[in-house]
Regions:
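Active-site-proximal beta-alpha core segment in soluble small-molecule metabolic enzymes
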Residues: 1-98, 107
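Structured binding elements
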Residues: 101
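Anionic-ligand-binding alpha/beta catalytic cores of soluble enzymes and soluble regulatory domains
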Residues: 108, 114-126
C-alpha cells in the first residue's frame, strides 16, 4: 500500500491464535492448521503501522469457529477477541472499532440440535 501511496481510512486485521487456542470446531479445525490470519505479534505490529499512518478505524477479525451451537466455544472466542482488543488499547492506545467473530453463531440444522442460548451468550459476553 505504501508503494502505491494508498492508505485506507478503514482497515481490519485477521487474527489466527495458532497454538494459543487449542480447539476450533469441526467445521474450521484447529487454528494452528489454518493458512490465514496473523499471529498476535504480527497483528500488533500492523496496528502500530495503521496508527502511524493515521488510520482511525481499525477492526479485528477471527475465524476459529463456524456455525457453533455451544456456549463454551462462542464465549471462548469472544473472550479471546476482547482480550486482544484490550491489549491493543493498552499497548498502542488504539480503540478497536469493531470485532468480527467470523462464522460464529450457528443455527440448528437437525431436529436433535438445540438453538444457541442467546440470553446466556449475552450474559456470558458481558
Amino acid at each position: 500500500m505504501e508503494r502505491l501511496h494508498l492508505v485506507p481510512k478503514r482497515i481490519c486485521f485477521r487474527y489466527n491464535p495458532g497454538p494459543d487456542l487449542a480447539r476450533g470446531n469441526a467445521i474450521i479445525g484447529t487454528p494452528q492448521e489454518a493458512k490465514y490470519g496473523m499471529t498476535r505479534e504480527q497483528l500488533l505490529k500492523c496496528v502500530a503501522w495503521a496508527k502511524n499512518k493515521g488510520i482511525g478505524y481499525i477492526g479485528i477479525h477471527t475465524m476459529v469457529i463456524s456455525a457453533e451451537l455451544e456456549l463454551p466455544g462462542l464465549l471462548g472466542t469472544i473472550s479471546m477477541m476482547f482480550d486482544l482488543a484490550n491489549e491493543i488499547r493498552n499497548t498502542h492506545d488504539v480503540t478497536v472499532s469493531f470485532i468480527d467473530f467470523g462464522g460464529g453463531i450457528g443455527i440448528p440444522y437437525r431436529p436433535e440440535q438445540e438453538p444457541v442460548d442467546l440470553e446466556g451468550l449475552g450474559e456470558g459476553a458481558k
